[in-house]
């Protein structure tokens, strides 16, 4: 596999640990993930103010913590972005994406609300998605207090967060929920079936591979794994993608999710959804976070931040 990795990404690839999220090693995996993600938290920046709030959760469920990133100085209502972190539906927190959310604020001129949704296996589907929907409703209903322009709310996330982004777009459409101007599911985890060609092609134990993906989906779906799974859990199963918001998505060439992302982007276009899609040669899952100094990583990040900025701009009538 190493010879397929982009030259700029090989150094970090060589030091990656093996991914083992199996049930017998899960607590160790969660501990490792927490320690790894903590190393990426935000350094102080006087241009961005970060705060935490607890908001009403779904019906008969606990409150949900959200982490809010906003410009320290703002003079008008800004577009809002609901960000959903990754972690295979099993690990992670808003803090792991502090640096990225700060960049969204500074470069896309927006306010970011990152949702600390409940995690599997303790809280399988639909709990994580319902937490995200509750956060979307809260942002929309409290937009004036948050200084957010309610006509310019986007949703975005990476990996499992990308899967939840795609699912949330479907759910908001079908429930006739808050209006979403743009969705940005990045390298999204959207297909529980694990039967696409790239699922069998990407086997290296240093990468999120088929074994890890099956384990993740089993934890997220719980008792319904292997059954006729809801498209709100696995958006690749959705048969109707019409009426979804304009979309930007991307994936690395040697990412397990390559095939399902390509299919998803293609089906969005067939459904008449304005869609931009990028694939990065030699990119493994999460490459731009794992090797942030590589030129290809910086290009990928610049391109999706640029797409978000453009989508959030006011349209003159």
Model regions and ranges:
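Gly/Ser-rich "nucleophile elbow"/oxyanion-hole loop immediately N-terminal to the catalytic nucleophile
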Residues: 140-155, 175
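Proline/glycine-enriched tight loop/beta-turn segments at coil->beta junctions
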Residues: 60-64, 71-80, 242-244
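Short beta-strand/loop motif that positions the catalytic acidic residue
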Residues: 249-251
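A glycine/proline-hinged amphipathic helix-loop "lid/cap" segment
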Residues: 1-68, 313-317
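Hydrolase active-site cap/lid region
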Residues: 170-227
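Short amphipathic alpha-helix adjacent to the substrate-entry channel of hydrolases
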Residues: 95-114
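Alpha/beta-hydrolase active-site loop
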Residues: 123-145, 304
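Catalytic active-site module of serine/aspartate enzymes centered on a nucleophile-bearing elbow/loop
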Residues: 294-317
């Amino acid at each position: 596999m190493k010879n397929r990795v982009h030259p700029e990404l090989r150094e970090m690839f060589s030091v990656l640990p093996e991914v083992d999220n199996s049930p017998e090693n899960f607590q160790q995996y969660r501990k490792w993930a927490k320690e790894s993600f903590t190393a990426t938290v935000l350094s102080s920046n006087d241009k961005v103010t970060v705060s935490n709030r607890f908001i009403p959760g779904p019906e008969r469920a606990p409150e949900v913590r959200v982490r809010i990133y906003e410009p320290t100085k703002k003079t008008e209502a800004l577009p809002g972005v609901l960000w959903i972190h990754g972690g295979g539906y099993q690990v992670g927190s808003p803090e792991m994406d502090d640096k990225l959310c700060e960049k969204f604020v500074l470069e896309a001129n927006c306010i970011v609300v990152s949702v600390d949704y409940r995690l599997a296996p303790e809280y399988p589907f639909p709990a994580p998605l319902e937490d995200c929907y509750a956060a979307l409703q809260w942002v929309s209903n409290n937009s004036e207090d948050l200084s957010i322009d309610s006509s310019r709310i986007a949703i975005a996330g990476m990996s499992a967060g990308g899967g939840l982004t795609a699912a949330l777009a479907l759910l908001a459409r079908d429930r006739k929920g808050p209006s979403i101007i743009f969705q940005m599911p990045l390298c999204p985890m959207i297909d529980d079936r694990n039967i696409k060609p790239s699922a069998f092609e990407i086997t290296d134990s240093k990468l999120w591979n088929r074994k890890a993906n099956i384990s993740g989906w089993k934890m997220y779906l719980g008792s319904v794994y292997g059954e006729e799974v809801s498209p709100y859990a696995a958006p690749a199963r959705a048969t109707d993608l019409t009426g979804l918001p304009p979309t930007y998505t991307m994936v690395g060439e040697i990412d397990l999710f390559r095939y399902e992302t390509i299919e998803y982007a293609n089906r969005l276009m067939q459904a008449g959804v304005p869609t931009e899609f990028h694939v990065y040669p030699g990119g493994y899952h999460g490459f731009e976070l794992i090797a942030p100094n590589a030129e290809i990583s910086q290009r990928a990040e610049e391109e999706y931040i640029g797409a978000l900025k453009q989508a959030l701009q006011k349209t003159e009538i």
